[in-house]
A protein has these predicted regions:
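Extended polysaccharide-engagement surfaces of secreted carbohydrate-active enzymes
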Residues: 49-233
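Active-site lining segments of carbohydrate-active enzymes
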Residues: 1-53, 57, 63-66, 157-174
Length: 233
């Protein structure tokens, strides 16, 4: 935001370069630019390469910066579609109660509504076919009592669509029957997404960043409850 406010174009481009194209890592310390972070730190479907409890914070900060640039003429989401995928990927690995797997060393995370609203905004802007599925997800989360759009505050007022478009996919594209999170070799099987009648199983245990907490483990979902690993927060 500070860089975008600079009137001197040379200075503005210099500071924006640290986000857009310039890495500053020396001896393991520094900052990665968006192109490098997108290449190294995201799975092909947009999951941050750490357990789900770590996903929302770094992704939300990258998206906040991307939205500022989008509002100033930079087509960041068009150039880096992985950011859009990262905005809603937690839904893909969610149980029917809309909590996600607790693999690794964090508690059980949820889809960030701020990120989902950003995904809806950009999918609407670029008229992407994923938009109806994202709108369906927002409605499901509202009906489940996990989101009240009227209380989104200044962020909602300044950054979200004034109203959600009327669209319905009629399909559950975000909740496939089988999924694999590649970097963690985490596998899931899903039978329905109804919070009471849906069933789901998650199995994982490969060696990866932050997997010192669980070892080989399994999570089972049924009758509205997840049974299995819970490493805490």
């Amino acid at each position: 935001a500070a860089a975008l406010s600079l009137k001197d174009a040379r200075k503005r481009n210099f500071y924006l370069g640290f986000y857009l194209n310039r890495d500053t890592v020396v001896d393991g310390c520094g900052q990665l630019s968006l192109p490098t972070a997108s290449k190294l730190w995201f799975t092909p479907d947009g999951h941050w390469k750490e357990p789900g409890g770590y996903h929302n914070y770094p992704v939300s900060k990258l998206i906040e910066a991307a939205l500022m640039l989008e509002n100033n003429g930079y087509q960041i989401f068009n150039q880096y579609p992985i950011l859009l995928k990262a905005s809603y990927v937690m839904l893909k690995y969610s149980f029917p109660d809309l909590t996600a797997s607790a693999f690794g060393d964090t508690g059980r995370p949820r889809q960030s509504m701020e990120c989902l609203e950003s995904a809806i905004l950009m999918a609407d802007k670029y008229q992407l076919p994923i938009l109806p599925d994202l709108l369906d997800a927002a409605i499901i989360l509202e009906r489940a009592g996990q989101y009240d759009r009227s209380k989104s505050g200044l962020t909602g007022l300044l950054c979200y669509l004034p109203e959600l478009p009327k669209a319905k996919s009629g399909d559950d594209h975000l909740w496939n029957r089988s999924e694999k999170l590649d970097f963690a070799s985490c596998y899931l099987q899903r039978n329905g997404i109804d919070s009471q009648d849906g069933l789901m199983c998650v199995v994982q245990g490969a060696t990866y960043n932050h997997n010192h907490s669980n070892g080989m483990s399994m999570e089972l979902y049924g009758a509205g409850t997840v049974q299995g690993i819970d490493p805490g927060n």
